[in-house]
């Protein structure tokens, strides 16, 4: 493990005191945080969590910390991390939390603790400009559309000024502009130290800043992507750290499943062909025969890729994901074998070119990797993986995802560190960490569970309407729309309506039509950041959204006074990954619904409902329109997990609650019915 280089003055006073004692002093009523931070208020839960985190920094091990909203968990782990003197890796599930830590919390703590430390904010490689690839694209003679030329000029102007190469600095570059994929610093295109632009490489600079930093902030996508690349022995950017803190840890299983799998897509084949044509157009070789042969093979590979991915489309069932097996892939064998053969010829021809450049060697490596991955996918016989076809717009992906990532998370992410803290507002089910322990491979761990600091009996009411049909009913969407119309009349808009699927959202949107007297914002009509900005600024707005708005959203005050959830968020048993995980549980004699689907749905539901009460002054209505929470036996598990807000089945109680001044919120609402 790489040796840490802590800032020398991190611990200059009271060396005889333990870290736990110094952290306790920082959080004391008369401590430095209380004296310097205007919004600081002593919270018992925050102190307890900070002490538990400090114990990990002193003694090692793993800590599972569930800290309800309002606990102040971010400061509870940042203060011990800063004071520990170790290099600490902090990974978050959302960009919002990354931004909060780097731009708000760390500067405030630097002043409050009077401690000098350095921090680096790291993003995934795809966020950074590759100077070498950009130079090739800019100087090539490829035909470009006017809009592509305009975007390239925007990047060109910015590239001469930026110190970081982070595309987030370019306000005029849309998130989904295709040209960025050609010039970003993704690992499969990286030439490493052989790159002519290596000394000026933005990714190399970022990694050097991280090596020299005490606190390194990443997100789960970079954490897992980097660990997966590290296994293949090239391209990692995160330096070794003694300790890690994984916030929003409930998201880690899904992200790890994505990055520790294998995927081959029509995009990757198209990009390989495009990059090869561009390189050949530069006349970088004195071997014209091999160059002509390579042109032929590239064209052949493109044609065979079109045939192969076109044949895959025949397997696509209803929905975006379709499970495949060695049997269902059999009709594609010939097309896949021809594509594999072309990739093999591609690689061999590149290797035979005399005086080939580093760029050509990188292309050969990419072709070999695609060849190996296609062979693995074609066999589709590894019992540890689930194989499926995924369609995303024009993208066609053949994937193999690990069914169980617990050993991967344990061995590749957690055991690399002397100590790790996994924290979230939602880690326990039925009062136990057993579910998350099993999913993330956490065998031995310390545990701490801290309730929310908010007074839900005063700040919220839970509305469960009695007359809703079952979600499978043809009347469900129209009933949701009717219920929304009546509920939003009481709340005067100011609501998130969160749906478990786009199909449900679209059906309710169509039912609502123009009947709502409030501004209606719909996911998909504009970028996520635009919708959030409009919701915060347009009075009485209503937002209809799906999964991406269930987590990581913070709208304070009366702007958001109601969160409506249409259905209990069960993962679809038709989803290939869900189905495979349920089969594994069933094969060992377990109950996949009780052991997997219900716990996962409970954590997801709590995240969705958690959008409402974010601060002590927030008040509002939590509305769940799924009758199964009342009528099914498993509904009791959901009810027991919900915040302790009063429950009502009547809109008149909701109106009374909203009309009641703060601190009298539960006076005229029913007692809790749990």
Regions found by a protein language model. Give the residues of each.
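A substrate-engagement module of RecA-like helicase motors
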Residues: 2-36, 86-214, 221, 276-292, ...
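Conserved pre-motif I regulatory segment
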Residues: 13-65
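Walker A/P-loop NTP-binding motif
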Residues: 54-55, 74-87, 104-108
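Signature of the SF2 helicase/ATPase Hel1-core->accessory helical subdomain module
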Residues: 83, 99, 107, 187-189, ...
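Conserved RecA-like ASCE P-loop NTPase motor core of nucleic-acid helicases/translocases
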Residues: 88-96, 421-423, 493-500, 623-625
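A contiguous, basic/glycine-rich beta-loop/short-helix subdomain that forms a polymer-engagement track
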Residues: 181-216, 227-235, 339-468, 475-482, ...
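Conserved RecA-like P-loop NTPase helicase motor core
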Residues: 453, 461, 465-475, 520, ...
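Conserved helicase motor "Helicase C" RecA-like lobe of SF1/SF2 P-loop NTPases
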Residues: 500-524
């Amino acid at each position: 493990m790489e040796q840490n280089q802590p800032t020398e003055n991190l611990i200059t006073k009271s060396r005889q005191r333990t870290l736990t004692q110094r952290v306790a002093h920082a959080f004391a009523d008369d401590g430095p945080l209380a004296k310097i931070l205007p919004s600081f208020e002593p919270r018992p839960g925050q102190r307890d969590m900070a002490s538990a985190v400090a114990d990990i920094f002193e003694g090692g091990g793993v800590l599972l910390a569930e800290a309800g909203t309002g606990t102040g968990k971010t400061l509870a782990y940042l203060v011990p991390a800063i004071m520990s003197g170790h290099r600490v890796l902090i990974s978050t599930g959302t960009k919002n939390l990354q931004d909060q830590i780097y731009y708000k919390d760390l500067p405030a703590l630097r002043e409050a603790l009077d401690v000098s430390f350095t921090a680096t904010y790291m993003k995934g490689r795809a966020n950074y400009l590759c100077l070498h690839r950009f130079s090739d694209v800019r100087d090539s003679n490829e035909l470009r559309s006017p809009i592509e030329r305009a975007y390239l000029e925007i990047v060109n102007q910015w590239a001469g000024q930026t110190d970081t190469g982070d595309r987030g600095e370019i306000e005029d570059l849309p998130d989904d502009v295709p040209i960025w994929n050609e010039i970003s610093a993704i690992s499969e295109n990286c030439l490493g130290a052989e790159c002519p632009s290596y000394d000026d490489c933005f990714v190399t600079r970022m990694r050097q800043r991280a090596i020299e930093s005490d606190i390194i902030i990443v997100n789960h996508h970079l954490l897992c992507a980097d660990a997966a690349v590290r296994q293949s022995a090239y391209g990692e950017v995160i330096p070794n750290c003694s300790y890690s803190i994984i916030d929003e840890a409930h998201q880690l299983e899904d992200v790890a499943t994505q990055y520790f799998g294998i995927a081959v897509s029509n995009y990757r084949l198209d990009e390989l062909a495009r990059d090869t044509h561009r390189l050949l157009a530069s006349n970088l070789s004195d071997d014209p025969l091999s160059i002509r042969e390579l042109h032929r093979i590239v064209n052949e590979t493109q044609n065979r890729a079109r045939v192969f991915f076109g044949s895959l489309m025949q397997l696509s069932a209803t929905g975006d994901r379709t499970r495949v097996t060695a049997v269902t892939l059999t009709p594609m064998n010939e097309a896949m074998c021809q594509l594999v053969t072309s990739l093999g010829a591609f690689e061999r021809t590149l290797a035979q070119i005399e005086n080939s450049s580093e760029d050509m060697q990188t292309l050969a490596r990419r072709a070999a990797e695609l060849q190996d991955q296609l062979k693995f996918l074609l066999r589709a016989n590894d019992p540890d993986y689930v194989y499926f076809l995924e369609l995303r717009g024009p993208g066609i992906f053949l994937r193999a995802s690990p069914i169980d990532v617990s050993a991967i998370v344990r061995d590749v992410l957690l055991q690399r560190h002397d100590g790790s803290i996994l924290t979230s507002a939602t880690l326990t089910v039925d009062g136990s960490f057993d579910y998350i322990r099993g999913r993330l491979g956490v065998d031995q761990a310390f545990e701490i569970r801290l309730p929310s600091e908010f007074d839900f009996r005063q700040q919220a009411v839970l509305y469960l309407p009695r007359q809703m049909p079952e979600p499978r009913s043809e009347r469900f969407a129209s009933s949701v729309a009717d219920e929304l119309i009546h509920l939003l009349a009481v709340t005067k808009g100011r609501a998130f309506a969160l749906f478990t699927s786009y199909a449900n959202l679209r059906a309710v949107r169509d039912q609502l039509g123009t009947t709502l007297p409030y501004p209606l914002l719909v996911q998909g009509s504009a970028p996520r950041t635009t919708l959030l900005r409009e919701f915060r600024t347009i009075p009485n707005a209503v937002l209809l959204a799906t999964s991406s708005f269930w987590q990581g959203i913070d709208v304070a005050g009366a702007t958001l006074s109601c969160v409506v959830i249409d259905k209990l968020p069960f993962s679809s048993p038709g989803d290939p990954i869900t189905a495979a995980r349920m089969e594994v549980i069933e094969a060992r004699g377990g109950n996949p619904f009780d052991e997997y689907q219900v716990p996962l749905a409970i954590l997801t539901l709590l995240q969705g409902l958690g959008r409402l009460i974010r601060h002590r002054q927030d008040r509002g209505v939590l509305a769940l329109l799924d009758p199964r929470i009342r009528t099914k036996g498993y509904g009791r598990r959901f009810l027991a997990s919900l915040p302790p807000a009063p429950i009502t089945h009547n809109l008149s109680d909701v109106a009374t609650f909203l009309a009641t001044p703060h601190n009298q919120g539960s006076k005229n609402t029913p007692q809790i019915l749990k």
